[in-house]
Amino acid sequence: LNERTVWGVSLGGNFSRQKENAGMFTEIQEIGVAGNTYSYAEQNRNNLSVGTSMVHKLKREGGELSASFDYFHYYRVGNQLMDSFKPDTLKGDMKGNTDLYVGQIDAVYPLSEVWKLQAGVKTSFVTIDNTAGYMRPSVSGWLPDGALGSRFVYDENINASYLQVGYEKDRLKISAGLRLEHTHVHGDFGGNTQQKDSSFTTNYFHLFPTIALQYGLTSEHLFQLSYGRRITRPNYGDLNPFTYIFDDYTHEGGNTKLHPSFSDNIELGYVYRDWFQTVLFFSHTDDAIMKSYREQEGRRIYVMPQNLSSYVQTGMRVHAANLSPVSFWKVNLTAIGIYNNYGWTEQGQKMKNRMFTPIFGCMNQFAFTSVWSAELSANYNGRMAYGQATVHPALEVNVGIQKKMFRNRCTVTLFAKDVFNTNYQKVDIQSPGVQAFVDERHNKRVLGIAFSWRFQKGSDTKESRRKKEIDETKRVNL
């Protein structure tokens, strides 16, 4: 608009059509039950986002005032047929709508050459409307199953404000902040023959302090220390009480009684010459949201999210960036060691699941010429404790090649993910009354091509800060 004021508009969307055929084998040794179930599913997803933002530079150098508003719409419709060649064959139709509105205002004001003040407010509104219906075959045709499906409507409003002050002089940087949040939630469940119709309303206030300290011992050696308290809210789909049927022996559903988890996080880091970093970290979480596995009716596993009483994570992360064995080859290496310790109570028994896990990552970048480049990455996760479950090791290898054309205005990329189809999930579950082993062999390999065209040469548009802060979009798992 002028030399100090910039206004922007963004529009995005994606549309997908997906079909999936799957086979599932279940064996329950104690009661001598075994069977195969075949699932045929089809899903259509339409997502839309619209946003506008304005940034105004104040006359005082370093001062800035910004405001933004974003709207997101997520729509999903799907149908599924589960055939076990027995009378328990089931057909389901599901539909979901999510509307998200987010607005925020932020201000940055330098108090002096060494002191800076930041403040802001944010509000968000979320509305979810999900319906599901199931039918079973009979001599007279398909008839509704009144024990499954219904309608679930969920409304959420979050209002937040924050204040942060920063100090920077010579080799020392200090920042401290405080965020206040108020959350209002209301949900309605239509009920069915197995569950009564119900509703719930929740209101709560919480404070979240943060503090960070950074000190440069010399120009090459930097030390960092930080503390922050965080909130993790349930994904919207995890609150949905509908039951998803894998087969007659495995059901999964949401939990309307889920509440947020709160964590205290401490990190101590050391950086050498901007290319080598090592971090010691510690996190303690109350009411961690994890999947639980329960026996139902002596013949079925019911999977649902629940709050575990405690979760403690400690570990060390080492990262080396931009290593260059030869002129055209750059390597980024990451090694992480994590110790997870979960605790909860089930059927009057105190349960524990704790384990050390190694994680490794390697990213290779090759610049063969000014227009040809390639990437090769590999990631390995070791055996890991995850709530009530133990997850087996997994490996993924990705590769891509890129060509720039037409004076670098056009870029064509050919990529492949999980080249060797090794990133599958294998899980062991043990809890009172339940011992289960899950082996999911989804084919996650992807071969794709991407094309981009830059219409005008100039400075790259920086990603708006607000996009990174819209946490509500990460909670949509319809």
Predicted regions and their residues:
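Outer-membrane beta-barrel and related beta-rich outer-membrane complex signature
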Residues: G8-E27, S66, V77-D83, D129-P137, ...
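Residues that define the transmembrane beta-barrel architecture of outer-membrane proteins
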Residues: N44-L48, N97-Y101, D155-N159, N203-L207, ...
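Outer membrane beta-barrel strand-and-loop segments of large Gram-negative receptors
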Residues: L100-Q104, G146-G149, N255, H259, ...
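Outer-membrane beta-barrel signature, preferentially recognizing the C-terminal barrel domain
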Residues: S150-N157, T202, I231-L280, H284, ...
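Conserved C-terminal beta-signal and adjacent last beta-strands/turns
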Residues: M355-L478
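Extracellular loop and loop/strand-boundary signature of outer-membrane beta-barrel proteins
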Residues: G32-Y40, P87-D93, L143-R151, T193-F200, ...
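Surface-exposed extracellular loop regions of Gram-negative outer-membrane beta-barrel proteins
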Residues: Y75-V77, D129, G141, H184-F189, ...
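Face-selective signature of the C-terminal outer-membrane beta-barrel domain
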Residues: N2-S16, A41-G190, G216, E220, ...
